[in-house]
Amino acid sequence: MMTNLFSVFDPSTTILNLSLNWLSTFLGLFLIPVSYWLMPNRFQVIWNNILLTLHKEFKTLLGPSGHNGSTLMFISLFSLIMFNNFLGLFPYIFTSTSHLTLTLALAFPLWLSFMLYGWINHTQHMFAHLVPQGTPPVLMPFMVCIETISNVIRPGTLAVRLTANMIAGHLLLTLLGNTGPMASNYLILSLILTTQIALLVLESAVAIIQSYVFAVLSTLYSSEVN
């Protein structure tokens, strides 16, 4: 049972000893170029409005010290994560964002680059962040330790939050899907089906929210080092 339950997270599809499941990470790239040679439809108009809204919000979070075009990185990050979250809801498509391999690969380099930029170019500003304003002198050494630890675990919390949310929803859907064939009557089967549809809608919302949270927190971490 446990093997079947977690088999959806196992990248085991191979051809010539090459794992193919991770190629699903780039499936979203095949959907984007189509908009450049087709007439705009409602989906493209909505998507462009979403990107413009995100650009304005990220620009506000970065403040006047943000470089021109810096929001493009965070919008691309949001798009990549959201595409992978949504594609993982389709049958037989591997959910790459349910693995720390991908989420840590996104979170750690971003955090490390922000820290290197901040400590090299704004050293005094970074030291000032270690002691919140109004801290009593007696508590300053403890606050430095606490702030340092909270700063170091940021990439881990970013990665684990996204991974845990993706795993939890998929496990619930898998559990309900496995109990469907064992349903004794149509009433229980219809109840399971209704619950699965509700969970699928909820997972769609989680896919958007978690990609938005990941991008917004990355933007906030970037704004702190300026």
From Swiss-Prot:
Q: Which GO terms describe its molecular function?
A: proton transmembrane transporter activity
**PANTHER family, alphabetized:** ATP SYNTHASE SUBUNIT A (PTHR11410:SF0)
| The organism of origin for this protein | Anopheles gambiae
Which superkingdom? Eukaryota
List the taxonomic lineage: Eukaryota, Metazoa, Ecdysozoa, Arthropoda, Hexapoda
Describe the subunit structure: F-type ATPases have 2 components, CF(1) - the catalytic core - and CF(0) - the membrane proton channel. CF(1) has five subunits: alpha(3), beta(3), gamma(1), delta(1), epsilon(1). CF(0) has three main subunits: a, b and c.
Check the record and name the PROSITE patterns matching this protein. Answer: ATPASE_A
Q: What does this protein do?
A: Mitochondrial membrane ATP synthase (F(1)F(0) ATP synthase or Complex V) produces ATP from ADP in the presence of a proton gradient across the membrane which is generated by electron transport complexes of the respiratory chain. F-type ATPases consist of two structural domains, F(1) - containing the extramembraneous catalytic core and F(0) - containing the membrane proton channel, linked together by a central stalk and a peripheral stalk. During catalysis, ATP synthesis in the catalytic domain of F(1) is coupled via a rotary mechanism of the central stalk subunits to proton translocation.
Family of this protein: Belongs to the ATPase A chain family.
- Its protein name is ATP synthase subunit a
